[in-house]
Amino acid sequence: MSIQVYNTLTRKKEPFIPLEPNKVKMYVCGPTVYNYIHIGNARPAIVFDTIRRYLQFRGYEVQYVSNFTDVDDKLIRAARELGEDVPTIAERFIEAYFEDITALGCKKADVHPRVTENIDTIIQFIEQLIEKGYAYEVDGDVYYRTRRFSDYGKLSHQSVDELKSGARIEVGEKKEDPLDFALWKAAKEGEIYWDSPWGKGRPGWHIECSAMARKYLGDTIDIHAGGQDLTFPHHENEIAQSEALTGKPFAKYWLHNGYINIDNEKMSKSLGNFILVHDIIKQVDPQVLRFFMLSVHYRHPINYSQPLLESARSGLERLKTAYANLKHRLESSTNLTTNDEQWLAKIEELRNEFIREMDDDFNTANGIAVLFELAKQANVYLMENHTSQQVIQAFLQQFEQLFDVLGLSLQQDELLDEEIEALIQQRIEARKNRDFALADRIRDELKAKNIILEDTPQGTRWRRG
């Protein structure tokens, strides 16, 4: 079965057929860099990084572009409040963004274009829209003629008449129509600006992504993605700008991730329940946060709470423990035994099941359920008296490959095998010397590290719990 993708544009799942065989052009809207990112910003970074990884796993060559909005009203306001200039603030939070997403297991995009590095491209785009009659200039501002684009509203599934009822013109604006939106904003006193055919100013938000997506990926791209909150007006306006200019579809598939709620309340600044990634990863393993995000289908809302985060931590630890136990058993395993073909077939079936789930609109939640079944089967196998290196290797390979698809690490902050053996030896010596208090202390220390000891007539054996 081919990969099926839910397309916001058509509101249904469709077979994923890229424009060029085995090549995928993917554009993901990045952050406005005026502060540290919050967990709502982290979700699309994690989700679309995982989708990119899965497409690569399935053999596609993915060209992945994600932008930085490094000049806009929020940045100008932050610069004014902090007494710094816009480029300094943007640079600081771009660096912070990379630190945060790297901690969360996200790979960098192939290109991270910045608005300030593409002003000429944006100006040329606007000039062409004016030439085609889709835009007009008023006193240094340039607006897009929304009604001129007959398909306006097709992504958010709203009609122009419905939109008009909620539209209004702000004081001082000179639009022809309340639905028109800014492509270029004339600079106010003291604001950062660039020279343009319409005077000093800066780009509007929506035009930036249209211009940069076209520059780096071409007129039509395979996947355009972002948070659900960007569907309207941002992505709707991108379509209007890009398709008016080129006369071609802007993107074939539109993917949007769901919202994050905090303790069953929508995350919002007014409620003061924003959680910065910068802060939370000091308290929580970033891998746990990633695992938590992927444990829910990307289109569904997530409820963020400490109990759910703890459940994610416990679940991830169970998977890592199964992997660690397999590695521990590897050296003591033998060659193929009689029922190994049955186990190898079972492992292959679980791999295929993972692929089936991920092929169904990148269902990481069900993919993770398959990983738990893989861990369960591994634990059953390790209960056998004789285990084979080939089967252990097959289990290990699947853990490693599927964890990599999800951007997760199998490393544990734990004692090394050599450290465990050394502590067991100390405990044996303590018991010989009848120092039972020390022996019990060592057992308790190992138990706290999830190491279970079994005293047998043949000596002390251990396993990870």
Curated annotation (Swiss-Prot):
- List localization entries: Cytoplasm
GO:BP terms for this protein?
cysteinyl-tRNA aminoacylation
| Sequence motif 'HIGH' region, residues | 31-41
Q: How is the cofactor bound?
A: Binds 1 zinc ion per subunit.
What Gene Ontology molecular function terms does this protein carry? ATP binding; cysteine-tRNA ligase activity; zinc ion binding
Instruction: Locate the residues binding ATP.
Output: K269
Tell me the leader sequence span. Answer: none
Return the GO cellular component terms, semicolon-separated: cytosol
EC category name: ligase
Motif ('KMSKS' region) on chain: 266-270
| Protein origin, superkingdom | Bacteria
Keyword Cell membrane among UniProt keywords: no
Identify the keywords attached in UniProt to this record, alphabetized. Aminoacyl-tRNA synthetase, ATP-binding, Cytoplasm, Ligase, Metal-binding, Nucleotide-binding, Phosphoprotein, Protein biosynthesis, Zinc
Quote the InterPro entries the UniProt record gives: Cys-tRNA-ligase, Cys-tRNA-synt_Ia_DALR, Cys-tRNA/MSH_ligase, CysS_C, Rossmann-like_a/b/a_fold, tRNA-synt_1_cat_dom, tRNAsynth_Ia_anticodon-bd
Question: Which cofactor does the UniProt annotation name?
Answer: Zn(2+)
Q: Which Pfam families match?
A: CysS_C, DALR_2, tRNA-synt_1e
Q: Which reaction does it catalyse?
A: tRNA(Cys) + L-cysteine + ATP = L-cysteinyl-tRNA(Cys) + AMP + diphosphate
In which family does this protein belong, per the annotation? Belongs to the class-I aminoacyl-tRNA synthetase family.
Name-wise, this protein is: Cysteine--tRNA ligase
Chain's gene name = cysS
